[in-house]
UniProtKB/Swiss-Prot annotation:
<dbReference type="InterPro" id="IPR043129">
    <property type="entry name" value="ATPase_NBD"/>
</dbReference>
<dbReference type="InterPro" id="IPR000600">
    <property type="entry name" value="ROK"/>
</dbReference>
<keyword id="KW-0067">ATP-binding</keyword>
<feature type="binding site">
    <location>
        <position position="177"/>
    </location>
    <ligand>
        <name>Zn(2+)</name>
    </ligand>
</feature>
<dbReference type="GO" id="GO:0005524">
    <property type="term" value="F:ATP binding"/>
</dbReference>
<dbReference type="GO" id="GO:0006044">
    <property type="term" value="P:N-acetylglucosamine metabolic process"/>
</dbReference>
<dbReference type="GO" id="GO:0008270">
    <property type="term" value="F:zinc ion binding"/>
</dbReference>
<dbReference type="InterPro" id="IPR023505">
    <property type="entry name" value="N-acetyl-D-glucosamine_kinase"/>
</dbReference>
<keyword id="KW-0808">Transferase</keyword>
<protein>
    <recommendedName>
        <fullName>N-acetyl-D-glucosamine kinase</fullName>
        <ecNumber>2.7.1.59</ecNumber>
    </recommendedName>
</protein>
<feature type="binding site">
    <location>
        <begin position="133"/>
        <end position="140"/>
    </location>
    <ligand>
        <name>ATP</name>
    </ligand>
</feature>
<feature type="binding site">
    <location>
        <position position="184"/>
    </location>
    <ligand>
        <name>Zn(2+)</name>
    </ligand>
</feature>
<dbReference type="InterPro" id="IPR049874">
    <property type="entry name" value="ROK_cs"/>
</dbReference>
<comment type="similarity">
    <text>Belongs to the ROK (NagC/XylR) family. NagK subfamily.</text>
</comment>
<dbReference type="GO" id="GO:0009254">
    <property type="term" value="P:peptidoglycan turnover"/>
</dbReference>
<comment type="function">
    <text>Catalyzes the phosphorylation of N-acetyl-D-glucosamine (GlcNAc) derived from cell-wall degradation, yielding GlcNAc-6-P.</text>
</comment>
<dbReference type="GO" id="GO:0045127">
    <property type="term" value="F:N-acetylglucosamine kinase activity"/>
</dbReference>
Length: 302
């Protein structure tokens, strides 16, 4: 039995999956955001509860909005203050008497999609999230690749490539990022970035959904903005694909529901790739909000 936990800022979602990778149990509880001991006890309590229910010791995987320090195993996170700087994995392993795996939630999203029936034969899958932020995860041969420092796939904190700056023109905004740097892709390619760029060029705030609606209706500023954004996305995608060369790319997050992306990227990306390279297949995520739990559980698939 595979147990997965999606540990968020307000709730913890638990899921149990059988050997056929079918979900057989679900539970949601509030996240003890400021009480570390209670956080550990809450997770361990759910594990013990479902061990008893299923009569087996399930494997345990956690997806968190952050990552582990590669050297000391302590958690680096903002959204779950109780876990910040704490050895969450080690403490859970001591309490449960079994191995526990912890991964960034974007990596869990990518792993969930990589184990979908239609994609599980793909040698490599890249998950990209176009949501409040822009991030991703890498899966090779069914396993998350997180790198030496657990930051592989943190593409939101790569800076815009030079051709993207040329595309945005002399008035391109140099946006600051929460990581301390400027010009990170996170602030340009996310749903939030889609809105920030519109505000920068046209001097008015609009929600992404309203901009998209206006574009579909032919409103000139929205049409121009979407054209600019699609080319920006293609340039950045091409740089990312050149570095990682994935077989399949899965898009998640709110902006991934914009169907025009799937029409435009296969046409626009190739001209920014090496001449020998082909644009990978780009598809919409199938598992939505359940992806974090699925991916966390599937961290333990051998």
């Amino acid at each position: 039995m595979y147990y997965g936990f999606d540990v968020g800022g307000t709730k913890i979602e638990f899921g149990a999956f059988n050997e056929q990778l079918e979900r057989v149990a679900t539970e949601r509880v509030a996240t003890p955001t400021d009480d570390y001991a209670k956080l550990v006890e809450t997770i361990a309590g759910l594990v013990h509860k479902y061990d008893a229910q299923f009569g087996v010791e399930g494997t345990v995987g956690l997806g968190i909005p952050g990552m582990e320090d590669a050297d000391n195993g302590c958690v680096l996170t903002v959204n779950v203050p109780a876990a910040k700087g704490k050895p969450l994995r080690a403490d859970l392993e001591t309490k449960l008497g079994r191995a526990v795996k912890v991964e960034n939630d974007a990596n869990c999203f990518a792993l969930s999609e990589a184990w979908d029936d239609e994609l599980k034969e793909a040698a490599s899958v890249m998950g990209l999230i176009l949501g409040t932020g822009f991030g991703g995860g890498l899966v090779y041969e069914g396993k998350v690749f997180s790198g030496r420092n657990h930051v592989a796939g943190e593409i939101g904190h790569m800076r815009l490539p030079i051709d993207a700056w040329f595309h945005l023109g002399e008035k391109a905004p140099l946006l600051g990022c929460g990581c301390g740097n400027k010009g990170c892709m996170d602030n340009y390619l996310s749903g939030r970035g889609f809105e920030l760029l519109y505000e920068h060029y046209y001097g008015e705030k609009k929600k992404a959904i309203d901009i998209i609606t206006a574009q579909k209706e032919g409103e000139s500023k929205a049409v121009e903005h979407v054209e600019r954004f699609m080319e920006l996305l293609a340039i950045c995608f091409a740089n990312i694909f050149t570095a990682n060369d994935p077989h399949v790319v899965v898009l998640g997050g709110g902006l991934s529901n914009y169907d025009l992306i799937y029409e435009e990227m296969p046409k626009r990306v190739p001209k920014h790739l090496l001449s020998v390279a082909k644009c990978p297949k780009i598809v919409k995520a199938k598992h939505g909000d359940s992806g974090g739990v699925r991916g966390a559980a599937f961290l333990n698939i051998k």
